[in-house]
Amino acid sequence: MRFSRALVFRSAIVALLCAFASNANAELVARNWIAVSHQLAPSGTGTIDFTPHGTQPGLLYDIQPPEPQCSACHSIAGGDPSTSPEFRPFTTWSGSMMANATRDPLFFAALDVANHDVPGVGDYCLRCHTPRGWLMGHVVKPGFGPPNDPVKGASACLLNGTYDAPDDINSDMGGVTCHFCHRLMPNGPNGEPGYTENGNAWVDDVQCENTGGGPPCRRGPYAYDDGTAPPPHEWQYSQYHTESAICGTCHNVSSPDVSRMPAATDRIFGDGFDGSGALKTLKLDDGTDTGHPMPIERTFSEWQQSQYAQAPETTCQNCHMPESEDPDATACSYRINNRTGNLPVHAFVGGNTWVPGIIKGEFGAGLDTSGTNRTQSLQQTIDWSRQLLTTAAALDTTIQSYTPPTPSVPGAMALSIKVTNLTGHKLPTGYSEGRRMWLNVQVRDANGGLVYESAAYDPSTAELTQDPQARVYEVLQGIWNFHGTGTCDIENASNEKMFHFVLNDCIARDSRIPPLGFAPATAADPNGYDLRPVGYPYPETSPGSGVLVNYDTATYTLSVPAGTVTPLTATARLYYQTASNYYVEFLRDEAVNQGFADENTMCSDGPNRPFTVGPQSRTRGEYMYELWNNAPDDATQPGYGKSPPELMQTSAASTSTH
């Protein structure tokens, strides 16, 4: 009887939402509620299982916090070399977005949208953003004891700690922690196959043979020979920690694989649903359903299908954990066994320079109270990220043709600009929403006057002008047939871009530049649907090879006004941006228009509430918008710039040498 009431209740909710919301929004909400109702577990769980695979909460050995369990030996200590902040594991990790994945305000604003779109799906998001909190039973699934409130859990309201508190035993805010990564296994405890997506991790939860100290095993790419001093904890050599597959655990993301008890639910819904499968599957532009789980992020797979995955491999770690060149580099402050020199630095930097600065400004003072110099580490991450971005691409500008202007007759110019991807994945890669890279092209006269510009950017509004010749590299995912147009729709009824991460089921455009040797087709996906460019042609290196070029050649034609002072200089600049204006504005608008609660109200009965840092009495979306929009000296809420674009490369050519 209670199932029947639940169905009636859901139907009533859909009807009310459709009656009172705008047509487009009602369609989205109603469709979402219907989709969710078709996947609800029977009474007793009350939620969909978005995380059915891998090690589950309820460990024999807790995931220990980084402070002081790891920092005591693996951070800076008295007498260490002055370069120690550049290589000591805890110190370098603590400034990374890995370490601060549970402090990222952009993530939390997006989390609220996801939970609104598909109630409870935050469980799937938080598995990678707070693996300690998830495995300790502080999200949706309890570790031990009474059930969690699934709504509060999926919204991260049950996590211990605060955004500005040290990563100690009282905090789940330490992101992807040392103890989590160094307990990862390639297979399950009984030989179950491993996973390379969605945080479906196998975590070592046993004692091992090297019982030098406290259990459980800490796994890593080092061994201790007989007669040498072991660490004060159990250890085991792990080849897995040198392989890219370990990164694929969270850097391949598909629409969640949901699970329920089909025998009971099918009697209720009669939909023939078999109990598990992807929440959303990828549809082609004509509506054909591929049956593939929607490929949300594919950084690991992009690498896997590139030349970098071929022998001799260049792994993720080679670029994102580069070996220190300092002869004094050590992993441990005790410096036992005299192991120094080349050491994989736990830098984990990518292209994100903006959010580490926000975390530094918003939470740095509190994080520094433990004496770990967190603000220094965050700044180091920003600096390293900028440096890495300059190595990600090559840029070459060529004047293909030029007709000089005269005092009375206009001239003409044709440019060719080649952008080559030097990374082991698409450029840009990873989280699709808001990320973009573009070519800004300017032609100036002999006096520096602007003659022509493509992809002009206004830093005061963060508006990127997308003129007909503009080159913007991004992936735009959407909802197929959302407006009844029979296409992949990426805008709402107001012609504003929408970002419904967990509802997307199609790719309208993927213009990102492939890596070297990139072959999108695989045995499991012979058409390359998951990885191929969409709406933007990248030719094969040779006809029929199946391998795409790793560069884009952009051409520009322009008229030069009569009387322009020559020679002319054409300059190309390649920029990267973490979050576009329309993404941040969408997060704010969703929070306001959908009536999201402010964070302290939403999490009112959670640990350590109310918070005195972060959103507090604001919604997470509005807080994110203020961080993006406000002036740096705003007395109420300082801003940190509108995700300022980072200059990656520049290249120029002059008519004086043409």
Residue ranges and their predicted role:
Residues 2-12:
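Bacterial N-terminal signal peptides that target proteins for export
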Residues 24-26:
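Boundary at the C-terminal end of the N-terminal hydrophobic targeting segment
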Residues 53-72, 119-122:
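Local sequence-structure signature of Cys/Sec-based thiol-disulfide redox active-site neighborhoods
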